[in-house]
């Protein structure tokens, strides 16, 4: 089998030379891929990409055999392209998403994960149509970047906790090659999908869209029981999804060419990723966190 693409969310900040620091952090965890935000996830503040050490980042990655095509950017949380109630907020979301797409193109990271959003006080189906409308609008700015809509837990008024929602969106967007899906294992579990029956779950995916539409996987355990609709991530092996189930996901041959990204909680202000990556690759839960 090819190498397993396994990494995590890493920081990007000025004191660590932005993207160079992101690569160094990933290397320190023995990760061979990673995910970043291009700026604060809850704000519009952004540092110009000219100052992010893009060339140095790619040189450093080359020396460690990390391929830029495997990297992932997470879009800001404040983008809600599902808003069918407030036109101004929807337009803000679309314009901010366009900015993020441009930044991904400049950094040369080809996958942009996006939370589909919430219907707030609106109608559920209208929200799905707003998502489609937004994706059609931003597609002109996508040259090498694909948007991966993330599976959600169904907390509050979130849309896209059901695979059928993704089928509807993927069937109706104009530029189908520019949109895919990010599977989040915690969110899927919290939404009611039993991932311990992984083969059966993959069949459910195939009833709605092709497996090659899955562009990346967020690998998280869950602090809550199945169908809880909570979205509280647990460390690998310490939650209700379970270590063996997550090992099955990591080593699934159908997904060998896409990145599995950990977004698990820090323990005592320390990242757990080095231990989690080691345990997953060794297929052995060592209970060291």
UniProtKB/Swiss-Prot annotation:
Protein's recorded name: Probable endonuclease 4
Keyword Nuclease: yes
SMART domains given in the database record: AP2Ec (SM00518)
Co-factor: note: Binds 3 Zn(2+) ions.
EC number: 3.1.21.2
UniProtKB keywords: DNA damage, DNA repair, Endonuclease, Hydrolase, Metal-binding, Nuclease, Zinc
Pfam families recorded: AP_endonuc_2
Binding site for Zn(2+) 1: 74, 115, 150
Annotated catalysed reactions: Endonucleolytic cleavage to 5'-phosphooligonucleotide end-products
Annotated positions binding Zn(2+) 2: 150, 184, 218, 263
Protein role: Endonuclease IV plays a role in DNA repair. It cleaves phosphodiester bonds at apurinic or apyrimidinic (AP) sites, generating a 3'-hydroxyl group and a 5'-terminal sugar phosphate.
Similarity field: Belongs to the AP endonuclease 2 family.
GO biological process: base-excision repair
Gene name in the database record: nfo
PANTHER family noted in UniProt: APURINIC-APYRIMIDINIC ENDONUCLEASE, ENDONUCLEASE IV ENDODEOXYRIBONUCLEASE IV
PROSITE patterns: AP_NUCLEASE_F2_1 (PS00729), AP_NUCLEASE_F2_2 (PS00730), AP_NUCLEASE_F2_4 (PS51432)
UniProt GO MF annotations: deoxyribonuclease IV (phage-T4-induced) activity; DNA binding; DNA-(apurinic or apyrimidinic site) endonuclease activity; phosphoric diester hydrolase activity; zinc ion binding
Residue numbers binding Zn(2+) 3: 187, 231, 233
UniProt keyword Metal-binding, yes or no: yes
Named cofactor requirement(s): Zn(2+)
Top-level division of the source organism's lineage: Bacteria
